[in-house]
Amino acid sequence: MAKQEQAPDRANDVFALTSFLYGGNADYIEELYAKYEDDPNSVDPQWRDFFAKLGDNADDVKKNAEGPSWTRKNWPIAANGELVSALDGNWAEVEKHVTDKLKGKAAKGEAKGAAGTPLTAEEITQAARDSVRAIMMIRAYRMRGHLHANLDPLGLAEKPNDYNELEPENYGFTPADYNRKIFIDNVLGLEYATVPEMLDILKRTYCGAIGVEFMHISDPAEKAWIQERIEGPDKKVAFTPEGKKAILSKLIEAEGFEQFIDVKYKGTKRFGLDGGESLIPALEQIVKRGGQMGLKEVVLGMAHRGRLNVLSQVMGKPHRAIFHEFKGGSYTPDDVEGSGDVKYHLGASSDREFDGNKVHLSLTANPSHLEIVNPVVMGKARAKQDLLVGRTRDDMVPLSERAKVLPLLLHGDAAFAGQGVVAECLGLSGLKGHRVAGTLHFIINNQIGFTTNPAFSRSSPYPSDVAKMIEAPIFHVNGDDPEAVVFAAKVATEFRMTFHKPVVIDMFCYRRFGHNEGDEPSFTQPLMYKAIRAHKTTVQLYGEKLIAEGLVTQDDIDRMKADWRQKLEGEFEAGQSYKPNKADWLDGAWAGLRTADNADEQRRGKTAVPVKTLKEIGKKLVEVPKDFHVHRTIQRFLDNRAKMMETGEGIDWATAESLAFGSLAVEAHPIRLSGQDVERGTFSQRHTVLYDQENQNRYIPLNNLQKGQAIYEAINSMLSEEAVLGYEYGYSLSDPRALVLWEAQFGDFANGAQVVFDQFISSGERKWLRMSGLVCLLPHGFEGQGPEHSSARLERYLQLCAEDNMQVANVTTPANYFHILRRQMKRDFRKPLIMMTPKSLLRHKRAISTLAELSGESSFHRLLWDDAQYNKDEGIKLQKDAKIRRVVLCSGKVYYDLYEEREKRGIDDVYLLRVEQLYPFPAKALINELSRFRHAEMVWCQEEPKNMGAWSFIDPYLEWVLAHIDAKHQRVRYAGRPAAASPATGLMSKHLAQLAAFLEDALG
């Protein structure tokens, strides 16, 4: 009976392996059929007979072979490289490959049958079938093994139902086949292997304490490298006795530090690493292995969890300094002003040396807003890479050079899955203007987000799944197996240093206490915390393992713990009288700069440039190579600019900007301009990058001014505000010599990056003593384009202004724009600059300047006079100061609306005074100017609604000024749009009616 049942199965197996009616061959058969319909003699006689019997309609056959009209002719692209593709499942190809190899071996006498005789055709078929099935099983482990890995230290995670997808029986192997050697063509580092030998390697590699996800990677070289690195009989996680003792020592330091603070400062927030101590030896391994592979610097960013441990055990911050902060002391010397921040937000830097390789480490200060430090770290790393290479032209920096600086980001599991800025940063990782040769992401996966379980905080199996979108390899690892964690860190570092791509380590661990030390986690996670209380610490578990291996004794471990505690006691005593001796914020690249003071209230800097130099730069700005085909509209643009440079008149906004950039570049200041569509400019005004109309080659005049100049980079960024602005802020922290600018497509969209403005740009210097010279260009102006294309929300930035933290300007002339940009680099301190930039003024006939206004003794003016006061050829001549009836103060584009309306009405007793810089507020200068008009009525006019714009900010300042000059009118009158919920109307008729109304109010 059994034999009868077996026979049909055997026949089916042979048929399955030999039949041409296999799904993978469908395309081939259809093409053959179409060929037959064209010319029956063009196919083999056997096929001819076969097709003749089908009797299908010839047109249908041809149509079928062509496929649908929308298909791409070159699609799908044939897989290359690896024996088995991760995606195509083309087993017929594999079978053919294996069969050919087996036939070759049989012919050479290398492959023999059971009786020791050469393989028969049937035995070759059987052997090929075994090989294909074995490779299918191996592929299943590579793809799905991580789901069966032993990752959760608490053992609470539910085992997935795998439908026996990894069982040998699923691939046709019975226990009777287990002793048979199967040809696997060195797939696991073995030419032949039995099923148990394969399972031993596969389970150890993919289902142990490490689970690897890499089959989503499409680059065959990267996949093959990972397989080669972890698969094979000799690829076990193995450490020398010294290595194991070093891991134990680091774990004891990490655990001992947390326990010591818990005793000394009971209940104080420290966001301890308890439960995730394996992080510390893993970070050491990253620095050590990276150093061996050429790493020079690591820029770290991390949240609060375990930060103090990283600062002290990895960064080498003195324990006494941390204990000093715990008792409420400041982290800065007494003579340094600042508002300070909590201890688990502070940064630090140090040098570590392993095996003679010195690596500089810097931990970036950050707010509590999770993951927002990520782009800042990437930007800092990019600037450090540029400084290391010393870029002078638009050459591409090789990724092997960029790889010398590593951005290393530590994440929480819930935040990595939840915060959108994570995906934005992953999106930046491969872009030319933002790539950093791969960020190493380390997720401290304590399987909870404050009080929220993973099932409620993400829709994917792992927190790391978002990283699959950029094909990053992901190493999941059990935090209670320190050797596995250190091994994963080592392989991840090697991958990054080899391929210069991002990589993720997802360390499953737990949080021994609550979210902070004053929290009771059992309210919401009773079962998890019951398991945690019964669970031994990582140090206990690893100590027991090493004792069992005979490497250490319990006495050795107790002695190591006691020695460490004694060291901490000494540091604790020293911390009671500890005084920080110097602030490090003006070291390194920042040497030579100082903190700003009010000794020079105008703070102009020397921003003028000789006319001769400006003309030389201008000449280069309009030159293109002979064989370069410029678009005819761009050629007109260049011709107009050439005329401006020749006459020295009519300098428009974009030309003034290019002259500012060019003059800084020849003075050795690199320019980095980033944002959406900045090469051309949202309003087609900039055109600093030209494209050949025939081959799309680029030419950048600003990089061809003179030999030895600094580089100009215009980077069309991805469609993101938050990550890109954070990145540029980070860049500005590392390179104070560079003018770093971020431009919003419209200022209205800048609030997509509000966290960066609030947490870093406006407050970073006061909180963390970190200066930045970042410039934010925010197109702003009411022109009837509706509520999302009118307002950069000037009021938001003014509300953030205090303690001389940043500058806010709304300038109206190209000359003033030229000077304010150069001023950023021409003073010995750095402050962020928030600029409301124009839209309609870019081509306004009045918004022009002369070369004379950019040279000589000229400089930036915080206030600008009425053009009618000093331009002789204006339409009206103003009355003398004493006869001026009203002074209308304003800022930005509305000045030109007021000017034209006044001219139209022939009014000569209303003076228009522009406030070009709103903060720091030019109070003294305003006292001088308004003293001329003590008896005049004072009006503040703005185009924004009353609850927006500068009104609420400037009103108290203006009252203070009027009191000081003893003005007749002590209150300023408001003229502008009424308060509104939405910034602007979308109806042009309503826009014009509102404009007419407030112009009447201001001038009537």
Swiss-Prot record:
BP GO terms, sorted: glycolytic process; tricarboxylic acid cycle
Domain of life assignment: Bacteria
E.C. code: 1.2.4.2
GO cellular component terms, A-Z: cytosol; oxoglutarate dehydrogenase complex
Gene3D superfamilies according to UniProt: 3.40.50.12470, 3.40.50.970, Multifunctional 2-oxoglutarate metabolism enzyme, C-terminal domain, TPP helical domain
Keywords: Glycolysis, Oxidoreductase, Thiamine pyrophosphate
EC class of the enzyme, as a word: oxidoreductase
Record Pfam families: 2-oxogl_dehyd_N, E1_dh, OxoGdeHyase_C, Transket_pyr
Molecular function per GO: oxoglutarate dehydrogenase (succinyl-transferring) activity; thiamine pyrophosphate binding
CC cofactor: thiamine diphosphate
Catalysed reactions, semicolon-separated: N(6)-[(R)-lipoyl]-L-lysyl-[protein] + 2-oxoglutarate + H(+) = N(6)-[(R)-S(8)-succinyldihydrolipoyl]-L-lysyl-[protein] + CO2
Keyword Oxidoreductase in annotation: yes
Protein family: Belongs to the alpha-ketoglutarate dehydrogenase family.
Summary of the function given for this chain in its UniProt record: E1 component of the 2-oxoglutarate dehydrogenase (OGDH) complex which catalyzes the decarboxylation of 2-oxoglutarate, the first step in the conversion of 2-oxoglutarate to succinyl-CoA and CO(2).
Quaternary structure and partners: Homodimer. Part of the 2-oxoglutarate dehydrogenase (OGDH) complex composed of E1 (2-oxoglutarate dehydrogenase), E2 (dihydrolipoamide succinyltransferase) and E3 (dihydrolipoamide dehydrogenase); the complex contains multiple copies of the three enzymatic components (E1, E2 and E3).
Name recorded for this polypeptide: 2-oxoglutarate dehydrogenase E1 component
Native organism: Brucella melitensis biotype 2 (strain ATCC 23457)
